[in-house]
């Protein structure tokens, strides 16, 4: 198979879809890999490293899309890429269709086969291709939140861990999945007073056993969220419904409960966000205010640490990518239920129910 690895062009997206090690695995199996020039530079991989691994370098993104049977990316195609995706082409990347109607309709129109990292799902309902980036995003959410709590950055000027005689900052984490757990553990390690909430009592019971003493668990409800917002300095939203829009758990009227200069970090923004006042931002312009509350809603948080993120992501994606190229997408997805759940849009049809429901599009069950 001919595989293409384009350079990511989303704002400040510095990751790359395949490392030289991945290229080597592909080429030794007889596949051909084309990498766009400088695609891996920001992740620490030179064009020469790709060439040494067996890749061929192409100068433009148009060249890569035109020749490849399969595209391996990190983030969803942006508007300028829509015309490049063609009928029958397999695109393996994060899509987050439920957050973008234009993207969904463009991929339906293209006739491509869209296999989304975020909906590849194991029998235990874990999401193996989302976990590594969720680990990064959870840690980064606290790191960025801490930075923007500083007064010169627009926050209220609180130190996360406090000092002797001065209370630490209060961090409220909504959602106790991979992102939330990583965020709570990171904030606790910095000495903050942390509360994490979720709708799953078994999950909270588990966290109560394994988390540091400065992490408290709380059952998620509108009442409890409102109460926590009254004293929270940093709120991290990390709610996920696989493939679907995130629920809006913090409404605009709730912002009036918070102190001015408090910070909201919405890690769920790539699924539409879990705060009513959230809208996607970029690493160049990451924040904005609503009613005196600082919002950080960058949709590609891990893109700021591309070396770590690229290695973590490709460690997880490569085994699945190898199945797709060795067997072809139909047989690979027929043989592997985990991969099959990654199919969202196939040859003009939406085959993932939550995506169809998000935009009122016809849903067609997958036929392999």
Which residue stretches match the model-derived regions?
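Glycine/serine-rich phosphate-binding loop and adjoining beta1-alpha1 elements at the start
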Residues: 2, 8, 79-169, 298-300
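An N-terminal-biased, well-structured beta-alpha scaffold segment characteristic
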Residues: 2-106, 110
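Short glycine-/small-residue-rich Rossmann-like dinucleotide-binding loops
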Residues: 69, 75-76, 95-96, 221, ...
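Rossmann-like adenosine-cofactor binding region
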Residues: 209-291
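Adenosine-phosphate binding glycine-rich loop
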Residues: 118-144, 148-159, 269, 274-368
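Residue-level detector of alpha-helix initiation sites
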Residues: 76, 136, 177-178
């Amino acid at each position: 198979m001919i595989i293409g690895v384009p350079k990511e062009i989303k704002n400040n997206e510095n990751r790359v879809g395949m490392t030289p090690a991945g290229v080597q695995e592909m080429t030794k199996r007889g596949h051909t890999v084309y990498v766009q020039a400088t695609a891996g530079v920001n992740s620490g991989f030179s064009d020469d490293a790709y060439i040494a691994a067996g890749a061929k370098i192409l100068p433009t993104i148009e060249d890569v899309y035109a020749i490849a049977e399969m595209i391996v990316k990190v983030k969803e195609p942006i508007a300028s890429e829509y015309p490049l995706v063609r009928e029958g082409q397999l695109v393996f990347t994060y899509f987050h269709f439920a957050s973008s109607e234009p993207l969904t309709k463009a991929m339906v129109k293209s006739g491509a086969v869209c296999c989304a990292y975020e909906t590849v799902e194991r029998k235990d309902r874990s999401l193996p291709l989302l976990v590594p980036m969720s680990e990064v995003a959870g840690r980064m959410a606290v790191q960025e939140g801490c930075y923007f709590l500083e007064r010169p950055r627009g926050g209220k000027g609180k130190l996360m861990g406090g000092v002797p005689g001065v209370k630490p900052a209060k961090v409220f984490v909504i959602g106790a999945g991979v992102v939330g757990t990583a965020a709570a553990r990171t904030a606790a390690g910095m000495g903050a007073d942390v509360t994490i909430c979720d709708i799953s009592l078994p999950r909270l019971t588990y966290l109560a056993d394994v988390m540091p003493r400065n992490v408290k668990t709380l059952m998620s409800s509108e009442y409890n969220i409102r109460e926590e917002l009254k004293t929270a300095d940093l709120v991290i939203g990390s709610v996920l419904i696989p493939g679907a829009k995130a629920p809006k758990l913090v409404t605009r009227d709730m912002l009036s409960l918070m102190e001015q200069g408090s910070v909201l970090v919405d890690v769920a923004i790539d699924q539409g966000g879990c705060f009513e006042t959230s809208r996607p931002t970029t690493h160049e312009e990451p924040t904005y205010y609503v009613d005196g509350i600082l919002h950080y809603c960058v949709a590609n948080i891990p893109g700021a640490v591309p070396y770590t993120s690229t290695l973590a992501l490709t460690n997880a994606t490569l085994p699945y990518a190898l199945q797709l190229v060795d067997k072809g997408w139909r047989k690979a997805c027929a043989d592997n239920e985990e991969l099959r759940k990654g199919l969202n849009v196939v040859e003009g049809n939406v085959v993932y129910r939550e995506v169809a429901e998000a935009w009122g599009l016809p849903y067609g069950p997958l036929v392999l």
